[in-house]
């Protein structure tokens, strides 16, 4: 028996069953291990832009191995986006918020395990902190690097730049 399988006839069992059956979850799937896919995807940063596609692959893999997947979205701190406003004061609190969000969703829904799609230097520690606090079977998938951009100005035509190149050039410009 999985921790997510509530006692038949209990209030929690009835409410969950009503909610999930209305979402199209079949009766025979109700007894499977319920696995969260923690997805930090958003369209604010290139760190996360590819995670929705990976999430679909992970969902199918969970189904193929006898589990019931649930995508769970969280806030996604990114140094380059979150630090843009108010002198970066949201960066570390956002990481901690993410830990709390994961814990609330996992414990609130009483899910059996989680697979975390991690793709930034703040999401990885947050996922590891969540796994340690929750003490449920957890897998952290590091999902790749930031894609670079292509410059299309005069002498830089067809050159690719990553974020480090941008910082170096801004620094060079600032120092003359």
Where on the chain are the PLM-derived regions?
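Generic beta-strand/beta-sheet core signal
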Residues: 38-40, 72-75, 117, 141
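Gly-rich Lys/Arg/Thr-decorated short loops/hinges at beta-loop-alpha junctions or inter-strand turns
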Residues: 1-4, 35-42, 75-88
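Predominant activation on well-ordered alpha-helical scaffold segments within soluble catalytic domains
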Residues: 17-20, 35-38, 52-59, 63, ...
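Hydrophobic alpha-helical scaffolding
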Residues: 5-9, 44-48, 88-92, 117
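Glycine-rich phosphate/diphosphate-binding loop of Rossmann-like nucleotide-binding domains
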Residues: 27-31, 36, 42-73
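N-terminal amphipathic/basic leader segments beginning at the initiator methionine
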Residues: 1-32, 56
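Glycine-rich oxoanion-binding loops at beta->alpha junctions
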Residues: 15-21, 68-116
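Active-site cavity-forming subdomains of large catalytic enzyme subunits
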Residues: 91-176
């Amino acid at each position: 028996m999985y921790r997510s399988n509530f006692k038949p006839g209990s209030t929690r069992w009835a409410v969950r069953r009503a909610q999930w059956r209305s979402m199209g979850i079949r009766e025979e799937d109700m007894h499977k291990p319920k696995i969260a896919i923690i997805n930090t995807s958003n369209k604010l940063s290139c760190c996360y832009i590819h995670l929705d596609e990976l999430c679909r692959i992970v969902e199918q893999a969970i189904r193929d191995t006898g589990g019931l997947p649930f995508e769970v979205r969280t806030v996604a701190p990114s140094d380059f986006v979150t630090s843009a406003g108010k002198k970066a004061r949201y960066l570390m609190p956002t990481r901690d918020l993410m830990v709390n969000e994961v814990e609330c969703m996992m414990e609130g829904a009483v899910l059996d395990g989680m697979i975390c799609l991690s793709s930034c230097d703040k999401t990885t520690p947050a996922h590891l902190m969540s796994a340690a606090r929750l003490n449920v079977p957890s897998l952290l998938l590091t999902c790749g690097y930031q894609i670079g951009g292509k410059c299309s100005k005069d002498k830089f035509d067809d050159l690719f730049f990553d974020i480090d190149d941008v910082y170096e050039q801004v620094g060079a410009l600032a120092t003359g």
